Amino acid sequence: MARTTPISRYRNIGIVAHVDAGKTTTTERVLFYTGKSHKMGEVHDGAATTDWMVQEQERGITITSAAITAFWQGSEKQHKDQYRFNVIDTPGHVDFTIEVERSLRVLDGAVVVFCGTSGVEPQSETVWRQANKYGVPRIVYVNKMDRAGANFLRVIAQIKQRLGHTPVPIQLAIGAEDNFQGQIDLMAMEAVYWNDSDKGMVPVRKPIPAELQELADEWRGNMVEAAAEASEELMNKYLEGEELTNEEIKAALRQRTIAGEIVLAVCGSSFKNKGVPLVLDAVIDYLPAPIDIPAIKGSDPDNEEILMERHADDSEPFSALAFKIATDPFVGTLTFVRVYSGVLASGDGVINSVKGKKERVGRMVQMHANAREEIKEVRAGDIAALIGMKDVTTGETLCNADKPIILVRMDFPEPVISVAVEPKTKDDQEKMGIALGKLAQEDPSFRVKTDEETGQTIISGMGELHLDILVDRMRREFNVEANIGKPQVSYRERITKNCEIEGKFVRQSGGRGQFGHCWIRFAPADEGQEGLQFVNEVVGGVVPKEYIPAIQKGIEEQMKNGVVAGYPLIGLKATVFDGSYHDVDSNEMAFKVAASMATKQLAQKGGGELLEPIMAVEVVTPEDYMGDVMGDLNRRRGMILGMEDTVSGKVIRAEVPLGEMFGYATDVRSMSQGRASYSMEFKKYNTAPSHIVETVTKKQG
């Protein structure tokens, strides 16, 4: 089967934003204008097409990123052929940053939505940082221009100041608030208006209003200057006073956007149907096709040192990244993949190169929100869902078994909060186990474990809302009613002293014995190393090299049990430098136990300390309640970092220990008569004060 759309006309994009910037409404309009959905879904009445989980519709926030395929030929059909958009809708709530992170990982470009009134909000910064991390080219869309207090150029200034990027507007707003009418197109130098009769489908172009002509000339000049910086040739032309053609300007802005040097900005009101078609035009004009970005990097499964890459080309060996697992009520498990190279037909065999397991692809579907279309094959650049994968987890690579590769893995954050869950009835025990297993497979930032001493099931995640929603899903999707314990902080531990410790495990009484012996130098890890920093300095084969991995494993396993109060050890440097072995009795198990015994002794010799998670907290409050809010944060052992005025109120930034923040949502509402809001995300681990250490060690007994 030949390719229906050339890869140069693919756009894999995400629509990302802060919670209330109007992202889901924007995605809805994208579907409406691209002709895929005939009734506009509104988040306000819980009917949006991409919010397909019941809780999302109730809470009005988007939790799972649905991948949707749509087509666009231009707002005025200015392109001869259609472009194929794969649009991923992502959550903006900070408890779901993992969802945003994994979507950005597989996108080629993003539309970042800001609210015209509140501008750059705390989580906009989080999302922006994630997009920087993966080098995603982006366009800024300032939405909600019809809202009270909306101001396009103020938001542009905020982006420059708070996000450190220089936005280049290619439009200006005509009017604002109730008087928002449309945009000035700085490329065509025309005013663009929208009709209610066709729900803002086709732009109506007119001359620029006289009172805005001067402003338009000024910003057109800024845009042309940004374009001229793309190359020496254009710069010389510009400096010599020659006019640049619109074609030259467009090509230059596209080049600089894809290189991540600039961010183009447009404006509109998705809810009032004023401007989304021009956002889609900008996606075609300025965001990259899969062939415009560097080849994906990876490594050889047999030797991580050997780096490899795959180009976006059908003739290269097949490779794809599983970026999301979802459980579907009708077909079971859906594995969403981004295909980077090659072709895959249904019925083909592939290998999961991370686990070394073979998989056979059953059916393949492309999603349109929660409707689906069966397809027979996928090619480089496609995003699709595979049905029938047995053992694939988010972030793993599927590839051609003869030419394996492991694509760059995703980083998943460590959970910071845990609660105990138990089923309400004995009969639900097994069902709960299955449900939690499925949820953990879908969401790598959610962990499940059994407490060996109490037998309780402990679930851990990124915040209270994260765990609430997972427990809620367990009830709805798997019919498991569960009781939830009080939230517990996930503490960590580290050592403060350097020490050398001998680990020796010897059993030699009749028959095959055991002999493992190693000397390990322990120290706090180097800056920036969070887990185990393992160094092998054994010389002369006093410990054969095949036993070194067992020593590392022994240390890693013992680190989980901590040295102060049973919490995992982090930031540990362990250097194995000496030891001995026995020709007959030594084996991997014996060295693993010896290393584990040495690590255990850190409790006496390592000067262990308890660490507590510190959260970056931002509270937005009317000025009247500022004193109360700050006083309360101080009482919670918070450190106030700063304050600033915004349209939405005073913004207080602080760092507060997570243990002091439980139930804060209710407290901050009652302090401010429901008018303050807050957001928080994990920042770092800090040494816990003595009274916390005392309480925690007592509790652990």
UniProtKB/Swiss-Prot annotation:
Cited SMART domains: EFG_C (SM00838), EFG_IV (SM00889)
Please name the GO terms of the biological process aspect recorded for this protein, alphabetically: ribosome disassembly
User: Its function?
Assistant: Catalyzes the GTP-dependent ribosomal translocation step during translation elongation. During this step, the ribosome changes from the pre-translocational (PRE) to the post-translocational (POST) state as the newly formed A-site-bound peptidyl-tRNA and P-site-bound deacylated tRNA move to the P and E sites, respectively. Catalyzes the coordinated movement of the two tRNA molecules, the mRNA and conformational changes in the ribosome.
Mind listing the UniProt keywords for this protein, alphabetically? Cytoplasm, Elongation factor, GTP-binding, Nucleotide-binding, Protein biosynthesis
Q: Where does GTP bind?
A: 17-24, 89-93, 143-146
Q: Record's superkingdom?
A: Bacteria
Please give the chief subcellular localization of this protein.
cytoplasm
Q: Spell out the molecular function terms from Gene Ontology.
A: GTP binding; GTPase activity; guanosine tetraphosphate binding; translation elongation factor activity
Name all tr-type G domain ranges. 8-291
The subcellular localization recorded is: Cytoplasm
GO-annotated cellular components: cytoplasm
**Pfam families tied to this protein:** EFG_C (PF00679), EFG_III (PF14492), EFG_IV (PF03764), GTP_EFTU (PF00009), GTP_EFTU_D2 (PF03144)
> Under what name is this protein listed?
Elongation factor G
The UniProt similarity line reads: Belongs to the TRAFAC class translation factor GTPase superfamily. Classic translation factor GTPase family. EF-G/EF-2 subfamily.
InterPro entries hit by this protein: EFG_II, EFG_III, EFG_III/V, EFG_IV, EFG_V, EFG_V-like, EFTu-like_2, G_TR_CS
